[in-house]
Amino acid sequence: LEMENREIDGAEKMVPIVFLVIIGTIVVYGFLAGPIARRLGLAEAHVDGVLIAGSNAVARGLAGSLKSHGVKSLLVDTDPYSVTRAIAAGLPARRMSVLAEEAARDLDLRGIGRLLACTSNDEVNALATARFVRVFGRREVFQLAPTKLSAGGASVPEEYLGRVIGIQPITYAALDERTRSGWRVASVSGGSTVSNAAADGEFMPMVRVVDGKMAFLCRNDPIPSDGHVIGLAAPPFLERLS
């Protein structure tokens, strides 16, 4: 990646090869991670909670909104400040790399059935989904859209990505830009209020919650008309909700 940033000839061809090696290693360990975690009672099948890689403002907001609907979450981040803020807000959080070999073994994944990779690093997000696909299954590993993929110059091979959240793919850069402009995570009743705000560019739907069951919204999903929709809301929309 450093070679690519310095525009060294052939660097762009090496990135997929590097990812093949790294992900191949992760998959080998991953084949054991799921069965071991379930045997130890650390992970369960068919549960609704979410492991969130990243403890930034949006990740904490999502975890807080999910908690208000009775959905369990666990935040994991290497940044002590972000983890401390999560704990201070009453959210379960661990200071740990989601890519650590011991992560699937040491994290208490009881009640957790899916992953959201929500860090600022595209490569970490892709590698996290590769590691946890054997714990949760291919359909239950989600991530933000890689910035370079959205721009048409992916450094992460698309076949290694988890399921990208957002009816329109959401990048970390988009989330960061909006939170710096006062956007905040909000939970809104499904229906015309949400659909109108989304159409006006004032709301980014991310999660649907119905009767305590959550589902990430992905490409081309319809905006829910029932339950609650959790997403990032612009200041004018937040004012109308208050």
Predicted regions, residues:
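Cytosolic regulatory regions of ion transport systems
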Residues: 2-242
